[in-house]
Amino acid sequence: MSLVRKTSSGSNPKTSTHLIGSLARGLKAAVPTMDRRTFLRRSGIGVGAGLAVSQLNLLQKANAVETKAMLDGKAGKIEVKRTVCTHCSVGCAVDATVENGVWVRQDSVFDSPINLGSYCAKGAALREHGHGDYRLRSPMKLVDGKYQKISWDQALDEITAKMKALRTKSTPDSLFFIGSSKHNNEQAYLLRKWVSFFGTNNTDHQARICHSTTVAGVANTWGYGAMTNSYNDMMNSKAALYIGSNAAEAHPVSMLSMLHAKENGCKLMVVDPRYTRTAAKSDQYVRIRSGTDIPFLFGVLYHVFNNGWEDKKYINDRVYGMDEVRKDVMEKWTPANVEAACGVPEAEVYKVAETMAKNRPSTIVWCMGQTQHTIGNAMVRASCILQLALGNIGRSGGGANIFRGHDNVQGATDVGPNPDSLPGYYGLAAGSWKHYATVWGVDYEWIKGRYAPDMMEKSGTTVSRWIDAVLEKSDMVDQATNVKGLFYWGHAPNSQTRGLDMKKAMDKLELLVVVDPYPSATAAMAAMPPAAGGQVNKDRAVYLLPATTQFETKGSVTASNRSIQWREKVIDPLFESVPDHVIMQALADRLGFGKELSVNYKMLDSKYAGKSWREPEPESILGEINRSVWTIGYTGQTPERLKAHMRMMNVFDPKTLKSRGGKDPVSGYDTAGDYFGLPWPCYGTAAIKHPGSPNLYDTSKSVMEGGGNFRANFGV
């Protein structure tokens, strides 16, 4: 134990502000310069110490509980809770063993058709979230550069008083709310509703800086902004092109399906500037210059067209505009031009084209290696065009398999806090608002009255531009006013650029609220001294609110393949943490729209942090999602069906995801014909029993069997 403590220079690892101070010092040192070796050394020491301390504390907690149970003469209560890993979008199921309220063990679920009992290194460490010493333990307020513990009532009262003052003085658009892809579907949906009732569209989340280019690119190509097939369906692929994806590290369990496909003869090609662990498993590795994905893909198309490998019937029946693409490709993207742009010889490009064309169905996989470029949307469109030319979309083993990042980034995008749409990609036009006013059980004119004039149907600020919304002149931000108050709700700024500008923007705010299970880099940056020549707004107030992890609440989560799974609550909230949706309700109650927010929900009287809270039941929130999100088919995935799927995982085929039949012993629901997780679109009400759609745009099946065609326009 003494060795562990020495790594923190003798300071008490349980001091509330220890990590904040460490982050602040580290960030301060990092702003001018930090070489790679220093970064690795610091991060390695921190992680090692954290894991060691966490394990020791876990043993202490378990021993204490066991001793108390023995003294009381009571046998230990052991429960197994089924949850879903939070570390990526694959959706691996985990069974958590809880003894007397302490999470003591975790096991991968062998019955899960998605992960089949497998783990990656990240998933194997899942339990650390339930016992981390680095958790934010209580509400805190920044006072004279240091965080001080305060009560929940003080924090909520002061925050809402500041919000009301800003709303009155500078309109509701003076506040910006950054949501989270770590929220479950119910929390993400409730946050968008909550922000709407506050009276602004200034809300966003992580998808803006990861896969929003994918959503726009694929949605405007064939109708839905999502992965077309599934990880499991890749077992049916005869060839696979990974471009901008290092799945072996980022989505390790997804590689199981590809390795099974390779056993069946699938040819794996990896296109990446780096030789990655995924490339190490490839049949062909192609190194391109960073940012030249479009020339490369159009170079592949050149050989497809030049050799007559395109699917002419498919193009004639289902594709519009391919003649214009062919003309552009054949004139501009000759092998010589492609090699000049990408640095890839013609023979390598030809081999990729030949492999994709002669081994159909062939699939394409991309991640943020494409999407985070400044032209990410165009790169996504190029990938889509290649698959349309080859006739691979809407076919098992083909498709565009787009691996999302966070565990619920797909769900948060579908039903959560987007600045340019309401849940389900309903736009901001009056018709959309009237639809939701009806669903929410409130008057349309009441919602309209919550907004500043002309702002209700105007897109809000994005997470990538909130800095400008603070620092630029008001007439330059295309909003009613500058942003003066900011919520970081399950989001941290580490992955964004412009760190110095971000620090200046944070210093200029009048209100900064961080809602997170951990004291994130946001909290550290806020506590740092201002940059040279800068100053902190003397009226600024900074608060940290401890939220629970997803293992201390319950709700649904949408994997990258559009399958939805239900998480059980594993343990009660640690320390003084409170679930996100409960915090939303508490703020709404103080802001004057709590009744309107929860009018449709069953309300629970819950105990958190030693006090009573009004909690909207997550099942009730999902029921409202089922009644509202008709555009993309979130209507059939009721809590009852999802819970039955989680209990009956063993009846679903790991290759097709289809149930061979079996009744849930708890609810009596018969899973026969369902696809696991009821991947959207799952049309109609639960009574219709739509099975879900495993592969989008599959015309070999009827709509009621999970098939369907392209949509004429996104949102139709």
Regions found by a protein language model. Name each.
Residues L657, G662-D664, G668-T671, Y675, ...:
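Non-catalytic, alpha-helical, charged scaffold/linker segments
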Residues S8, S16-H18, A161, I632, ...:
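N-terminal compositionally biased, intrinsically disordered segments and leader/signal-like regions
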Residues A29, T33, S628-T631, F652:
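Surface-exposed polar/charged interaction patches
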Residues S2-W309, R318, V325, P345-E346, ...:
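N-terminal export/assembly segments and adjacent metallocofactor-ligating motifs
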Residues H211-I385, A389-R395, F403-T631, T635, ...:
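Non-catalytic alpha/beta scaffold blocks inside enzyme catalytic domains
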Residues S16, I20, P618, P639-A644:
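Short amphipathic alpha-helical segments that mediate assembly, nucleic-acid/protein binding
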Residues G101, G145, G397, N561-R562:
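Detector for glycine-centered tight turns/loop "hinges" at secondary-structure junctions
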Residues K569, G633, A644-G661:
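Polynucleotide-recognition surfaces of large bacterial nucleic-acid defense/processing enzymes
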